């Protein structure tokens, strides 16, 4: 390269002349007059520079150069002097954008753009004002201005709204076909409002969705499958459609919440303790929508608060059902047949009942919840029926060239897992084909409305059905109930629904029911309008007489007039009682939470109380026996198991009846009163208190006063406590017999003592008068029966206190007691108490009468029989007391006078109280004060002067098996002083 650059320039023959070079360069130029000459001279005078990457500086034909470098040099030389068009386009676009801003658009240009937010405002305003373009434009502008005042939204005018209205309708009107009798504004409103609702629910609209727009317009509701979810779309109950249907506008100012807060609290102490025993909060709060069924609400809480026995029963039933042989299912050749039914798990718990809170105001609902939230009453079919059109839009055939989803082939069973729930249902809701006659149109429409109704429709079926029952009762000429009610202002729908749904047994048997229930049952069997439950099969007669169909409008108008004349502002007492009684799973029917909220709810809250109903003992026993026999595993087939269960039930019938009678007797013997009603002389008063569920407080007070002033025969020296202890013994004995009958049969001859269950009051016997309206944290007062035992005076035999054996004191607690009627209790002592019983007979024979000796011999015979049960005896007999004391003393020093001197008179406080002269005055003044202070103050009046040093007077009157240690210390001190003196 250096050698070539240092060579002298080539000869002039090879070097091109400057003019030719300048001419060759200036050939592509458009003009070479002035500027071209200058350019030529400048190019010729400029020294040639070496270009980077070039091989030679001159265009020598003999020198070979790279094609890439030459091409690059040519590109540099032929570079255009003007900028490319891509660099000039942005300036033009910016100029155009600057000229046309949304605020400077002309109204008549026809190129108005609508954003998504503006479209949403358009459809909202359309639902409110209908085909009033000026009002719609004002509503859109107000919403856009409220949304953001500084935004660049173009405020719409009346003409722009009209243009968008007709453009949108023109795009979607091809999917819906209307009757010729239907006016054009009604067609436009029904199409646009339903399209706006579908657009609001679905994010993207496809051709498949537009195919269902017709069904939404005709029937008022559809279900669309989108992104794996079933989305339910209903025709909105807006003001525009209500005004078009000429419906009552009284519901426009009423705003119900979409969800309400339900507060549940226990109705009594039994329900409170039942839930608290499960370690759960008895007070609950749940937020549910208005269309929530009451029966599912009850089932939720029943499952949540089921008892431990029910849980164990369910686990046991599941275990036994899984262990049953499945041979019967293998014998079925048909795959479509269902498997053999497993043993159903019977509920051991009583049914749960929900009732309104006491004191809440129950008023007649001023609106029909069905008319408020229902979309069927304002659909196109209902509008055409209300207007009396002869040809319905729904009966018209599909347009030519349109693909209809109903005419498509159903999917096969191979993809059954991927099928949507909509395809699994029968396709009876599709529009009829072209060859369907027009006369069958109304019948087909009714069928479609019935099968498309769902359980989530806020009980619209039952309320429309019950609302039309009143019309049928007032106007017997109307043979059938219309499919849709025109008088939506019926204020008795919810009340009648609550009333008639309480007694399903009477509805099933009209012979035992009143006229209204009989009419409800008869109309239910022949009705074609609405089914009370979504699972009701549509197999009844759907044909309605044409005469009744023609008179439907007149009957409704007459019913509305009669209702206006017979308007009752308040509910009857019978309906109030039924509502106050509450609802269980059996009589909840199709009532929803919205129905209850309309009747006695307020401020988006609904207060309910719950309790468990009492179950008949015979019914519960029979169900438990059948359940046990059914669940018992066996190797036979299902039919054999059923037969064995029936035979076992027949065999155990007698034993179950006996057990039921015993349990009923025990339940009647135990009452919910904190005292023994047997102590009262007035039988009528006791019967009134024990039989009434919520008794009067005055009866309780009178009964307490009667107990303190009663006069009856004394059976023993400790007369005021024996009867109550005998009642406790009777309850404990019956409980022990029931426990032993249940499963302690093999331990009759054993020497082990069976631990007994503590004697408790059953939960059902808690005083129902006490409610939980004002619960505080103070302790609940309990009526405790204290067993008091009096020690003998020391003057009898000059016997010290320490000789009294504690073992012998407690041994008397397990001795049988002597009953008033001559029979003894079933409590049997152990083998260790046999010497005490024999000594008891020996010592008691010295000073007892022959009658008492016979009773003691009978007790000794009973004591020799050893049993597996050992009843805790709460009573202490006279003979037992004598035996306990005499067994610890020297037998040589025992005589009759010493034994009799122990209990010369009863030293109980009540005995001293009755013997005093001021007994009547103290009872009158302190009838409600049974405190220890008042009792001791009364005793001080009897004997105010007592010597403290006297050992006999130092013993406490109400000492509880205790030892006077102060007197003992005095004796020890005196003994030590005597020893020091000696």
UniProtKB/Swiss-Prot annotation:
Residue spans of biased composition, Pro residues class: 7-20
Chain intervals with Low complexity compositional bias: 21-30, 822-833
Localization (cell): Nucleus
Comp. bias regions, Basic and acidic residues: 86-98, 410-425
Keyword Lipoprotein: no
Family: Belongs to the cramped family.
The protein's name: Protein cramped
Organism: Drosophila melanogaster (Fruit fly)
Lineage: Eukaryota, Metazoa, Ecdysozoa, Arthropoda, Hexapoda
């Amino acid at each position: 390269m250096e050698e070539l650059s240092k060579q002298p320039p080539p000869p002039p023959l090879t070097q091109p002349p400057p003019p030719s070079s300048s001419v060759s360069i200036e050939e592509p130029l458009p003009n070479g007059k002035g500027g071209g000459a200058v350019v030529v001279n400048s190019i010729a005078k400029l020294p040639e520079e070496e270009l980077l990457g070039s091989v030679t500086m001159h265009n020598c034909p003999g020198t070979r150069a790279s094609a890439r470098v030459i091409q690059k040099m040519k590109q540099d030389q032929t570079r255009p002097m003007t900028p490319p068009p891509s660099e000039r386009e942005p300036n033009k676009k910016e100029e155009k954008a600057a000229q046309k801003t949304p605020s400077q658009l002309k109204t008549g240009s026809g190129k108005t753009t609508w954003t998504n937010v503006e479209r949403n405002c358009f459809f909202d305003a359309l639902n409110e004002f209908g085909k009033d373009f000026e009002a719609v434009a004002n509503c859109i502008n107000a919403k856009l201005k409220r949304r953001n005042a500084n935004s660049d939204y173009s405020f719409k005018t009346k003409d722009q709204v009209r243009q968008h209205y007709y453009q949108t309708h023109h795009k979607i009107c091809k999917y819906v076909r209307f009757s010729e009798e239907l006016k054009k504004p009604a067609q436009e409103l029904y199409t646009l409002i339903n399209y706006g609702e579908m657009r609001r629910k679905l994010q993207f609209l496809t051709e498949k969705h537009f195919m269902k727009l017709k069904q939404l317009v005709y029937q008022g509701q559809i279900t669309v499958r989108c992104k794996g979810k079933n989305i339910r779309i209903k025709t909105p109950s807006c003001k525009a459609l209500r005004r078009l249907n000429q419906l009552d506008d009284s519901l426009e100012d009423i705003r119900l919440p979409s969800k309400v807060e339900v507060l549940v609290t226990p109705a009594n102490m039994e329900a409170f303790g039942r839930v608290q025993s499960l370690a759960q909060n008895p007070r609950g709060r749940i937020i549910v929508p208005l269309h929530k069924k009451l029966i599912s609400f009850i089932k939720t809480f029943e499952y949540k608060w089921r008892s431990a026995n029910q849980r164990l029963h369910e686990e046991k039933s599941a275990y036994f059902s899984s262990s049953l042989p499945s041979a019967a299912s293998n014998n079925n050749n048909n795959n479509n047949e269902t498997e053999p039914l497993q043993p159903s798990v019977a509920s051991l718990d009583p049914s749960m009942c929900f009732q309104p809170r006491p004191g809440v105001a129950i008023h007649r609902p001023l609106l029909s919840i069905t008319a408020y939230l229902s979309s069927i009453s304002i659909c196109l079919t209902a509008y055409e029926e209300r207007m009396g059109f002869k040809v319905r839009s729904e009966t018209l055939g599909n347009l030519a060239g349109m693909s209809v989803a109903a005419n498509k082939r159903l999917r096969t069973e191979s993809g059954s897992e991927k099928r949507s729930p909509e395809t699994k249902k029968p396709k009876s809701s599709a529009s009829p084909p072209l060859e369907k006659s027009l006369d069958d149109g109304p019948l087909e429409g009714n069928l479609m409305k019935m099968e498309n109704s769902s359980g989530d429709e806020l009980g619209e079926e039952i309320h429309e059905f019950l609302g039309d029952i009143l019309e049928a009762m007032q106007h017997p000429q109307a043979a059938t109930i219309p499919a849709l009610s025109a008088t939506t202002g019926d204020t008795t729908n919810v009340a009648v629904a609550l009333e008639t749904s309480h007694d399903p047994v009477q509805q099933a048997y009209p012979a035992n029911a009143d006229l209204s229930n009989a009419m409800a049952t008869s109309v239910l069997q022949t009705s074609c309008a609405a089914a009370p439950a979504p699972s009701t099969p549509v197999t009844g007669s759907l044909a309605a007489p044409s005469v009744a169909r023609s008179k439907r409008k007149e009957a409704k108008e007459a019913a509305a007039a009669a209702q206006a004349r017979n308007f009752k502002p308040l509910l009857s007492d019978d309906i109030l009682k039924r509502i106050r009684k509450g609802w269980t799973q059996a009589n909840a029917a199709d009532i929803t939470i919205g129905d209850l909220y309309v009747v006695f709810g307020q401020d988006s809250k609904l207060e309910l109380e719950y309790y468990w109903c009492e179950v008949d003992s015979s019914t519960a026993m029979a169900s438990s026996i059948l359940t046990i026999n059914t669940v018992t595993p066996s190797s036979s087939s299902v039919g054999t198991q059923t037969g064995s269960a029936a035979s076992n039930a027949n065999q155990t019938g007698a034993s179950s009846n006996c057990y039921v009678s015993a349990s009923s007797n025990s339940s009647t013997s135990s009452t919910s009163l904190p005292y023994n009603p047997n102590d009262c002389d007035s039988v009528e008063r006791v019967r009134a208190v024990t039989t009434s569920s919520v008794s009067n407080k005055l009866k309780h007070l009178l009964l307490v006063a009667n107990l303190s002033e009663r006069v009856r025969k004394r059976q023993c020296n400790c007369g005021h406590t024996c009867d109550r202890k005998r009642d406790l013994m009777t309850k404990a004995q019956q409980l022990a017999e029931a426990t032993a009958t249940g499963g302690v049969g093999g331990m009759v001859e054993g020497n082990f003592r069976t631990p007994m269950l503590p004697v408790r009051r059953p939960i059902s016997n808690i005083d129902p008068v006490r409610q939980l309206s004002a619960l505080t944290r103070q302790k609940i007062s309990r009526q405790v029966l204290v067993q008091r035992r009096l020690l003998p005076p020391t003057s009898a035999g000059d016997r010290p206190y320490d000789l009294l054996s504690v073992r012998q004191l407690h041994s008397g607690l397990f001795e049988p007691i002597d009953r008033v009627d001559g029979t003894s209790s079933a409590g049997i002592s152990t083998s260790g108490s046999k010497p005490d019983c024999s000594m008891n007979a020996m010592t008691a024979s010295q000073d007892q009468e022959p009658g008492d000796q016979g009773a003691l011999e009978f007790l000794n015979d009973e004591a020799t029989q050893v049993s597996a049960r050992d009843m805790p005896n709460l009573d202490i007999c006279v003979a037992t007391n004598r035996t306990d004391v005499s067994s610890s003393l020297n037998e040589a020093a025992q005589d009759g006078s010493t034994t009799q001197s122990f209990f010369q008179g009863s030293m109980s406080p009540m005995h001293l109280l009755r013997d005093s002269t001021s007994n009547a005055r103290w009872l009158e003044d302190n009838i409600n004060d049974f405190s220890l202070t008042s009792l001791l103050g009364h005793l001080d009046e009897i004997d105010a002067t007592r010597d403290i040093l006297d050992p006999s007077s130092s013993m406490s009157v109400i000492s509880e098996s205790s030892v006077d240690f102060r007197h003992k210390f005095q004796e020890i001190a005196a003994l030590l002083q005597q020893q020091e003196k000696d």
